[in-house]
């Protein structure tokens, strides 16, 4: 017996915004979704042989591994049915565009400069991109109404690559300004962010009960140190999650990834992550100070990186390259004099600071 498609309330914002054909779409019913009970499993054309030593590697995984979903829901403070797991936050970006944007008709909105995959993902699906420049200090402009009409409005917080952290009041302002759009808050770096008083920055999950149009993206790539595992999460109202589940691939979370991710989300794993964040933020402060003392202008950062500006940034770029250090430059006009350097280990930071010390940007 196949599992039933969960109904999406027709009066929900998600139903009004979704691509019309998805409201009646019967998603692919994989063998794992159909389920069943028994001793011998021959319903999915799998191999009976497991030659890897990894338990379950020869079997298709659950689309949404229950243990992983429960672990991240507990960590994020949301209900399990308000969560979708996929191959990093990048997949969540694509899933949202595929679910809610009609190619050649709809558009997304972004505040620039920001993470490039919002625009790239939209372009690959023939979805237009409405762009609004950030203010001079890279905060949100006072008037953001120019993005009205966008189906999805992306807000990277902390912003990549500037590191700018928006207060929750600004996130609420965006949600209020665009009641007929989904406001997607990308919190890939939220674990690194702190308020001016040193307290941890509050996640926009605290606004989910108030705003039906709020979607939050999270990842295990940054603070949890699992970039190679590709595991991310979409947090939203159940109606949004249900529609996204109609377009997601049958098996987005490989068995080894699920095992690694659940371990990272254990009590010990979370404690280790928080300890790592403290260490990395300490090295980031050292890095920012060294750059400032070398005459560069460094933006306050809520991420695990610093963005530094110099009229002769090429001098620093060459010094880093000569020392075998690979940093990030940008082609965006507002970032042509900038370089982004990720936080590193103490020993690596020593090497970066040594390379910075060889330049004179003053």
Swiss-Prot record:
GO molecular function, one term: histidinol-phosphate transaminase activity
Catalytic activity: L-histidinol phosphate + 2-oxoglutarate = 3-(imidazol-4-yl)-2-oxopropyl phosphate + L-glutamate
Class of enzymatic activity (EC top level): transferase
Gene3D superfamilies in the cross-refs: Aspartate Aminotransferase, domain 1 (3.90.1150.10), Type I PLP-dependent aspartate aminotransferase-like (Major domain) (3.40.640.10)
Gene Ontology biological-process annotations: L-histidine biosynthetic process
Entry-linked PANTHER family: HISTIDINOL-PHOSPHATE AMINOTRANSFERASE (PTHR42885:SF2), HISTIDINOL-PHOSPHATE AMINOTRANSFERASE-RELATED (PTHR42885)
Subunit structure, interactors included: Homodimer.
Matches recorded under HAMAP family: HisC_aminotrans_2
Family: Belongs to the class-II pyridoxal-phosphate-dependent aminotransferase family. Histidinol-phosphate aminotransferase subfamily.
Entry protein name: Histidinol-phosphate aminotransferase
The species this protein was found in: Shewanella amazonensis (strain ATCC BAA-1098 / SB2B)
Gene from which this protein is expressed: hisC
């Amino acid at each position: 017996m196949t599992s039933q498609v969960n109904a999406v309330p027709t009066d929900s914002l998600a139903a009004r915004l979704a691509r019309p054909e998805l409201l009646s779409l019967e998603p692919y019913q994989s063998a794992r979704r159909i389920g069943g009970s028994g001793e011998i499993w021959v319903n999915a054309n799998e191999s009976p042989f497991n030659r890897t030593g990894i338990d379950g590697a020869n079997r298709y995984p659950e689309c949404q591994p229950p243990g992983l979903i429960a672990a991240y829901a507990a960590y994020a403070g949301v209900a399990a049915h308000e969560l979708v797991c996929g191959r990093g936050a990048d997949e969540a970006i694509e899933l949202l565009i595929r679910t809610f944007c009609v190619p050649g008709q709809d558009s997304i909105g972004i505040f620039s400069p920001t993470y490039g995959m919002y625009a790239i993902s939209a372009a690959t699906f023939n979805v237009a991109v409405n762009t609004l420049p950030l203010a001079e200090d890279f905060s949100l402009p006072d008037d953001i109404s120019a993005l009205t009409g966008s189906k999805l409005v992306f807000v990277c917080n902390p912003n990549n690559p500037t590191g700018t952290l928006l207060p929750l009041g600004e996130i609420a302002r965006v949600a209020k300004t665009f009641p007929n759009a989904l406001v997607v808050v990308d919190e890939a770096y939220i674990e690194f962010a702190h308020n001016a008083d040193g307290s941890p920055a509050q996640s926009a999950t605290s606004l989910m009960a108030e705003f039906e149009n709020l979607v939050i993206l999270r990842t295990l790539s940054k603070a949890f140190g699992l970039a190679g595992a590709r595991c991310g999460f979409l947090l939203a109202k159940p109606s949004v999650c249900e529609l996204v589940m109609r377009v997601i691939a049958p098996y987005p979370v490989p068995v080894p990834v699920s095992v690694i991710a659940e371990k990272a989300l254990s009590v010990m794993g979370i404690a280790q992550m928080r300890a790592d964040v403290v260490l990395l933020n300490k090295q980031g402060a050292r890095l920012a100070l060294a750059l400032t003392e070398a005459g560069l202008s460094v933006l306050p950062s809520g991420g695990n990186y610093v963005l530094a500006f110099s009229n002769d940034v090429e001098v620093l770029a060459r010094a880093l390259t000569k020392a075998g250090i690979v940093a990030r430059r940008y082609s965006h006009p507002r970032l042509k004099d900038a370089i982004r350097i990720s936080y590193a280990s103490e020993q690596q930071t020593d090497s970066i600071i040594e390379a910075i010390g060889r330049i004179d940007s003053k």
